């Protein structure tokens, strides 16, 4: 954690990715991406929500910035009369960022991962969300749905018990006549 904070500070002080690569040995790919995120942060800091250009909001979302992070970075008028905690203020501001996105019809779309390399149709498509423009490829149904939350990333040697449990849960949901969504 400290290393990332130090990199953040080094970029803030003007060091370039090439310099940091020589000093740290960190792969330039990671440093270039971190520098790009810092550059977006810097641009966000120069706007209020009402001044924020829609294309910068889209760029921030594409780069993975949450509404909460955007709310932390934007300039806000001083509110000396507020009895809210800092966290409550940030949550309130994140709600305003979310509302601004909705007003601009800025929402993620879902795309399909072709797990069969176009060799044949996949019966269990994988979807991912993206802020890229284009059509949404999900096909929601009117059926009742249940969500199965997977165990997340596994490390080598952990075993496949979590995957097996998720598969059995999905099979049970389908047997009950409902649609299963595995996250």
Show the residue positions of the predicted features.
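ATP-dependent carboxylate/acyl-activation modules
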Residues: 1-183
């Amino acid at each position: 954690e400290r290393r990332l904070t130090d990199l953040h500070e080094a970029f803030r002080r003007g060091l370039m990715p090439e310099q940091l690569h020589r000093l740290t040995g960190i792969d330039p790919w990671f440093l270039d991406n971190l520098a790009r995120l810092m550059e977006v942060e810097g641009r966000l800091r120069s706007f209020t929500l009402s001044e924020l250009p829609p294309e910068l909001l889209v760029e921030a979302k594409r780069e993975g910035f949450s509404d909460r992070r955007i709310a932390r970075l934007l300039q806000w008028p001083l509110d000396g009369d507020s009895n809210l905690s800092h966290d409550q203020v940030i949550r309130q501001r994140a709600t305003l960022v979310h509302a601004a996105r909705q007003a601009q019809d800025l929402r993620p779309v879902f795309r399909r991962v072709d797990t069969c390399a176009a060799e044949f149709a996949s019966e269990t498509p994988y979807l991912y969300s993206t802020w890229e423009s284009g059509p949404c490829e999900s096909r929601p149904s009117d059926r009742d749905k249940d969500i199965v939350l997977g165990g997340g990333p596994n490390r080598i040697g952990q075993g496949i018990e979590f995957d097996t449990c998720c598969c059995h849960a999905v099979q049970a949901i389908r047997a009950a006549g409902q649609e299963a969504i595995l996250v």
